[in-house]
Structure formats: C-alpha cells, structure tokens
Amino acid sequence: MPEITVRAKSKTYPVYINEFALEDVREKWTESLAKFSHVFVLTDEHVAELHQAKLDAVLADLPVVTYYVAPNGEEAKTFRVYEDVMTKLIETGLDRKAVLIAFGGGVIGDLGGFVAATYMRGIPFYQVPTTVLAHDSAVGGKVAINHPLGKNMIGNFYQPEAVIYDTQFFATLPEREMRSGFAEMIKHALISDQTLLRALMDTFTEPKDFYTKDLTPFLQRGIEIKANIVAQDETEQGVRAYLNFGHTFGHALEAYGNFGKWLHGEAITYGMIYALTMSETIYGLDFDLAEFKTWLKQLGYDTTFDATVPFNKILENMRHDKKTTFNEISMVLLEEIGEPVIFKAEDDLIFETYKRVMRNGGNGI
C-alpha cells in the first residue's frame, strides 16, 4: 500500500493512502488500538450515517469503543461543541491511556485533534479522513476550532499517530465537496510544482472527472509536498506559511459568511485568484490567469466576485489572520509558479487588488 512518512520535529508517522486503506491496515491498527484503555471515535452526523458501519467492522473486536457524533460542517468547530465533547470524555471516564479517532472531513480532524491535544494535556489520536479536502488538513498537526471573529484562531500543533486515508469514502461525496477539496490540491501545485499544476489542468476538465479519474496519485503528491514543508517547519515560523496561499483572503471571506455561506475550498479559490492578482501587480507573475479561471469554471467553480461584499469587513477579518503581526497583513504571493514568498501588504494595495478582482468579475460572491 502507498505509504508516505511525515517527519515533523515532534513526531514521525505514516500516512496510508489507497482505495482499501482501512482494510489493509486493519490487523496492524487494531493491535495498536488494543493497547489503549478506551477508543473514542469523533465523527459527524453525515459520516456516521454513511460510513460508521465500515469503521464498526474494523473496531469490532475492541472491548471499549465510544462514539460522539458532532453536527455537520463548521458548526462543529465551536466552543459549544468542543465543550460538549470534553464533557462526554470526562463523563465516560477516559484516562490518559485512551485514544481518539477523528473520523470525518477536515472539520472533524481539526476538532478531534484539538480535543486530543487538550484533554488531560494530550492523548494520542488517529486521523481517518473521509474527504478530498482532508488530504491537506489531516496531515501536519494543525488542530483548531473557530472563533466568531476568525477561523482556526484557537488551536495547537499536535501530530497524529498515523493517518489512514481510505479513498473509497469519496464515492459518497457531493460534487460541491469534491470541488472544495480539489482546491487544496490546486494550491499545493501553485506553491510548489508547475508540472503538477499542468497535470491537474490536463487531467481534470469537467466535474465528472472528480469521480471517474484517479485522484490518488495527485493526493499523494499533495501530501508529499505538505510533508516536506512540515519537516522543515512544523510550527509555521517560516516556510510552512506558504501553505496558507489563498487563505488570508479566503479565511476573511469565510468569516464574513459566518463559516457557512462558502465551503472552505470555495473561499480559498477566491483567495487564490486574489493572491494571483496581487502577485501580478507586485512581482509581474507570468501566469495566464484568464486561462486558469476558465479551467476553474469548467470544473464548476464560481470565479466571479461581488462588489456587495464590503471591503471594510474583509479587511477587518484579514487583520485577524494568524500571519498578521504588528497590525501588518502578510500575504502569501508567488514570484513564479512554485516560488512562494511572504509579502507585507499595505491597506492601499489590498484595496486596489480588491477593486481589480471586482472589475474582472461579476455577481459571484
């Protein structure tokens, strides 16, 4: 089975990825899980309905397994749900020899990792992603919940014991969710690998390709790109910030939409267009943005911007970005495809770029 090793400073662990990953690692994994006092599975309503039976079959021989089913979507990454999960852990009597399994998409991985990092100052956990988007979020140890004023503002760096990535789960993903996750694959290509970007553009030309073409080699390459960056900079003191390409504007947009109007990948797509536009202005980026947007539209992305989204709200939210220091907004831009750089952006430039993308778009947002 394809296996990628993540070598973070705090921990080295495997990422198992293929169409039958759960079954392939079943014996080895359950032997490891049997050493823990209790297995606590955190999932959401949608994943529980569709896939809990499959995980139940894998965990059937373990003596003590407890489930917590969180709400769907970003609602799960709130103080209220976090507190409720903690209450469940305490009431169930989990000790420091317990283990948590985050079984779901990126939201569940973020919440589950943060719960594991903070319960009794830390218990082990496994990531079992079920979405394309989670190929990014499940790897690297960033775990967090949201605050109404900003996405992922309360969090930690806490690595899993392993990531078990069974791509069979993709078959039940709605097209919108597939597209959202694919945006992070595009991001990895833009910041690191022009050849990968061209391969994505040549291979995936319409929405049905998400289901009929093999995503696995592209997911593997994206995970390898992220693993390489995490190995250099686990806690985002330097190059790991490059993984936030498109996220400064994208997270601001998500916050404006109360973390529900746009899926994460949808907001990040707008953010990447915004960052590419600013990169043209600052670095003269040689990139056919019109061709890129046409390709995105063919895949079903909405690439147009709506001037009714108030700039002052976006700017305010951008100031809450984790890269902002001394009230200076940091953008991840590209000097060339595959050559990211951190740039301190003045408010005037942020506004001029905002006006430019608005002129080039219609009523999309």
UniProtKB/Swiss-Prot annotation:
Cofactor: binding details: Binds 1 divalent metal cation per subunit. Can use either Co(2+) or Zn(2+).
Pathway(s) this gene product operates in, as recorded in its UniProt entry: Metabolic intermediate biosynthesis; chorismate biosynthesis; chorismate from D-erythrose 4-phosphate and phosphoenolpyruvate: step 2/7
Keyword line: Amino-acid biosynthesis, Aromatic amino acid biosynthesis, Cobalt, Cytoplasm, Lyase, Metal-binding, NAD, Nucleotide-binding, Zinc
Broad class of the protein's primary localization: cytoplasm
Matches recorded under Gene3D superfamilies: 3.40.50.1970, Dehydroquinate synthase-like - alpha domain
Entry's EC annotation: 4.2.3.4
Binding residues for NAD(+): 106-110, 130-131, 142, 151, 169-172
UniProt subcellular location: Cytoplasm
Catalytic activity annotation: 7-phospho-2-dehydro-3-deoxy-D-arabino-heptonate = 3-dehydroquinate + phosphate
GO molecular function, one term: 3-dehydroquinate synthase activity
UniProt-listed InterPro entries: Dehydroquinate_synthase (IPR050071), DHQ_synth_AroB (IPR016037), DHQ_synth_fam (IPR030963), DHQS/DOIS_N (IPR030960), DHQS_C (IPR056179)
Cofactor: NAD(+); Co(2+); Zn(2+)
EC top class, as a word: lyase
GO biological process terms, semicolon-separated: amino acid biosynthetic process; aromatic amino acid family biosynthetic process; chorismate biosynthetic process
Functional description taken from the UniProt entry: Catalyzes the conversion of 3-deoxy-D-arabino-heptulosonate 7-phosphate (DAHP) to dehydroquinate (DHQ).
Name of this chain's protein: 3-dehydroquinate synthase
Recorded name of the encoding gene: aroB
